[in-house]
Amino acid sequence: MAKQDLILLHAPSVYDFRKEFLFYGPVSDLVPSTPVFEMYPFGFMTIAAHLQSNGYKVRIVNLASMMLNDSDMDVDSFLAKLDADVFGIDLHWLPHAQGSLEVAKLLRSIHPQSKLLFGGYSSTYYHDELIRYPQVDLVMRGDSTEVPMLKLMAALENDRDLHDVPNLSWK
């Protein structure tokens, strides 16, 4: 697979929901999704479009949906085939914190040189806690982060100081 500058990856609510019996609580009537939360946030598309229009290679991977549709999918092998400087994982809703953090652990073990970035509503609220996890390098805070994401990608590409990137927590 061609190398990407950024892969935006949507994890399932629980990793690995295919191997464990879990009792799921109710899902909002407003969000047409199963308890696996297979719908990625709309912001993935706006961030990807903005970065692509500025010359970056961006791919969206809906891992939750892929796993839901293929019970035999080998997640480790699939993730190993991906190649990106940065993997962005959404933590939009708190119920999918476990899945996002576990997939980030897998990515860290498979791609130790790549940066792991979290974003979304819950990431914003819990950025101080998230950044303490060893598998989390960066947290983009806020909504409508297309401009800060562009600044982040440019800073990483040019090995510049991250202090000038708005809305960013890092270690």
Where does each model-flagged region fall?
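Short amphipathic alpha-helical segment that frequently serves as the phosphate-/nucleotide-binding helix
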Residues: F23-V27, P41-M45, L101
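Proline-rich low-complexity regions
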Residues: A11-P12, Y40-P41, H127
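Nucleotide donor/acceptor-binding cores
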Residues: A2-Q4, D85
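A structural preference for long, well-packed, hydrophobic secondary-structure segments
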Residues: P32-H50
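Glycine-rich beta-alpha loop elements in corrinoid/cobalamin-binding modules
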Residues: G43, H50-K171
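Short glycine-rich His-centered loop
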Residues: Q4-V36
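Short, basic and Ser/Thr-rich N-terminal targeting/leader segments
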Residues: A2, E38, M45, L162-D164
